[in-house]
Amino acid sequence: MKKQNMKRGKTMLITILVVIVSLSIIAWGIIAYLGRGQTLSVLSIEKLEGDLSLIHLAKPDNMQWKAGAHAKISLPNSIDNPQTASELVTGASKSKAKDGESSRWLTIASNSNEGEILILTHNSGSPYKKSLTNLPAGSKVELSWLDSSLSTTDSNKPFVCFASDVGIAAIRPIIKEELGKRELVLSHLSKGVMVFNNELEVSAKNHANLSYESSSSLSQSQAYLNEAVERYGNDATYLLAGQADDVNAMTKFLEDKGIDKKKIKTSRFRGLK
């Protein structure tokens, strides 16, 4: 009996060790997959209103991501870019901006099927943003760690969306992907960011399942979403993206209206500079 117990205990220990090793291998595999970087070419950079830029990057054929995803964008090394890059923009062709920051997490404003990667961002003065938004066409950047905090498994429940400022970059791909599939409500507190406004207005006209407004104040957006709250309640998923203060205020508004916090998914844009 004693030998049987020892044998059983040894077998159990081996099983536990095998499970631990297997899980470790899987975990490292996931980390390696998410963290692997790809070098992308800058196609063009549109200078929009104010300090806003829309960056167009070449998309590798095999690259896929979830709508609303963000990624780590690293500045190029000097060996990967023409010498003229440093002549055009101080620090643009170096691996680090003047403050030592060489990468930031930025949201992808396009879907995998659009043929290019769009990055919508402010240039509010940081060395990193100055370098990024002034890279000449043909420059290289590295993209890695694709992830999303707005993904959901709900197959057909309504999406009620709020975007503040450049937070529209996270919501636009979700709207494009879900058109015709579920009820969609979107209020964009634009703060002058109107780059996708015409596109969204046309989509709302052509798709009865999309209700869209461009808002001029947080209270206006809250009033717009309140109608959706009264209509859908906790049967909808609430997707909020943009400046942290606005997202926090909208989250509190929804919770005060009785929306379960599990139904609210957020993406806070903390690094607008």
Which residues does each predicted region cover?
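Ferredoxin-reductase
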Residues: A27-A137, S190
